[in-house]
């Protein structure tokens, strides 16, 4: 006689648990959009900290959420069967006042929303609008047009800027800290190109008119195929890109536009679900519809190159740098066949995965091990005594939310 109930009820392709999930800026917590409102969880240990339910004339659905660190402000966009807000409107929800303190309406649906203490960045299908973060938002610069498919990323970081002054040389060479708002987006005119803009470089004429301002941008030729994802490092110094092919991940320097790393995820075409930098900006996590999670190391020789590299003429498969570690994800626990996930870092040696439709949280830990080198494995250049450091990705825990 069966007396034990299963931990997870397998309901394939039922109603989605969440309509959207998003990590906050430091990845210490995440927000989830639902048909009834939104929820906020601490990443590790996993715990629900906020749960809001709307009941305004039966209109309660939230389709997108974006937190502002751990503050009381949360960006919301309507969604689901009965949207609480229009899909072409953003609402900045004040959780202390229990009301939306700011709302801005657009002519087309909102694809992405980024918040900082200085800016509100709204990404539409083919354009980006930037406003000041205030009770009465004002436009910072003219509308950025000709972007591709509502794809963009935005980070804020501190940087040094040389101050200029007519008084003396010492003052002219002095430096000051400024808050830079780095914006990256693919070109809608030239597939494969991305544009980088720093909002702190906005050139404003004497006339107080946002339409007269100018935002300088730099261009990086990243891929031959259309861009699928761009992800800026937390320090605003590098940008990771992938195309619709999903086989190569490229990392570029924002300052020079030069290629720093080219990583190979695999040979078969794949849909990249998400890419995420760790806090130090020296590791990049990539998860795809092949149900694999890859970790790439930046500026270190910990990634793997193929055993036959250097023995045969240049072949793209052999030349690529592979991940320092990877793992195959267990799809048996998912309650939806076609689910997508977001990845976030817990410190520098652990990660969390959020499965949107299934409402499942997973924690993976990077474990290092030392073992004898085998012929059928990849080589590590400069490994002493035929031994090399290897890393594994191990699932430590999971939970149905």
From Swiss-Prot:
SUPFAM superfamilies: WD40 repeat-like. It holds the Pfam family PROPPIN. Belongs to the WD repeat PROPPIN family. Disulfide bonds: none annotated. GO terms for molecular function: phosphatidylinositol-3,5-bisphosphate binding; phosphatidylinositol-3-phosphate binding; phosphatidylinositol-4-phosphate binding; phosphatidylinositol-5-phosphate binding; protein-macromolecule adaptor activity. Keywords: Cytoplasmic vesicle, Membrane, Protein transport, Repeat, Transport, Vacuole, WD repeat. One of its GO terms (biological process) is protein localization to phagophore assembly site. It is a peripheral membrane protein. WD repeats lie at residues 222-262, 267-306. GO terms for cellular component: cytoplasmic vesicle membrane; cytosol; endosome; fungal-type vacuole; phagophore assembly site membrane; vacuolar membrane. It is found in: Vacuole membrane; Cytoplasmic vesicle membrane. It comes from Eremothecium gossypii (strain ATCC 10895 / CBS 109.51 / FGSC 9923 / NRRL Y-1056) (Yeast). This is SVP1-like protein 2. May contain a beta-propeller domain involved in specific binding to phosphatidylinositol 3,5-bisphosphate (PIP2), leading to the association of the protein to the membrane. Involved in mitochondrial or peroxisomal functions and amino acid signaling pathways. Its main location: membrane.
């Amino acid at each position: 006689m069966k007396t034990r109930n299963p931990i997870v009820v397998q309901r394939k392709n039922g109603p989605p648990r969440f309509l959207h999930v998003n990590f906050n800026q430091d990845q210490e917590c995440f927000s989830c959009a639902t048909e009834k409102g939104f929820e906020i969880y601490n990443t590790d240990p996993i715990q629900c900290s906020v749960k809001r339910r709307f009941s305004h004339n039966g209109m309660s659905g939230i389709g997108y959420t974006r937190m502002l660190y751990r503050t009381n402000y949360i960006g919301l966009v309507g969604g689901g069967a009965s949207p609480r807000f229009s899909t072409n409107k953003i609402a900045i929800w004040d959780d202390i006042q229990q009301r939306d303190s700011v709302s801005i309406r657009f002519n087309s649906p909102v694809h992405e929303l980024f918040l900082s203490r200085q800016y509100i960045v709204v990404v539409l299908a083919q354009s980006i609008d930037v406003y000041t973060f205030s009770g009465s938002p004002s436009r910072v610069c003219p509308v950025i047009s000709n972007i591709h498919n509502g794809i963009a990323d935005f980070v804020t970081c501190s940087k040094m800027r040389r101050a200029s002054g007519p008084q003396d040389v010492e003052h002219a060479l002095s430096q000051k800290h400024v808050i830079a708002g780095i914006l990256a987006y693919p070109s809608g005119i030239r597939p494969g190109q991305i544009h980088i803009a720093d909002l702190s470089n906005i050139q404003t004429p004497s006339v107080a008119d946002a339409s007269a301002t100018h935002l300088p941008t730099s261009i990086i030729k990243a891929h031959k195929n259309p861009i699928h994802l761009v992800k800026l490092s937390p320090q605003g110094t590098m940008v990771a890109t992938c195309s619709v092919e999903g086989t190569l991940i490229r990392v570029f320097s924002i300052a020079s536009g030069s290629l720093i790393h080219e990583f190979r995820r695999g040979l078969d075409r794949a849909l990249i679900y998400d890419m995420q930098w760790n806090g130090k900006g020296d590791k990049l996590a990539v998860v795809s519809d092949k149900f694999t999670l890859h970790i790439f190391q930046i500026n270190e020789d910990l990634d793997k190159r193929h055993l036959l590299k250097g023995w045969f003429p240049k072949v793209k498969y052999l030349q690529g740098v592979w991940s320092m570690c990877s793992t195959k994800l267990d799809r048996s626990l998912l309650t939806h066949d076609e689910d997508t996930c977001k990845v976030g870092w817990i410190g520098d040696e652990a990660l969390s995965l959020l499965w949107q439709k299934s409402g499942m949280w997973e924690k993976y830990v990077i474990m290092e091990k030392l073992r004898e080198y085998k012929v059928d494995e990849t080589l590590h250049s400069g490994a002493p005594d035929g031994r090399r450091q290897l890393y594994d990705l191990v699932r430590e825990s999971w939970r149905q939310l």
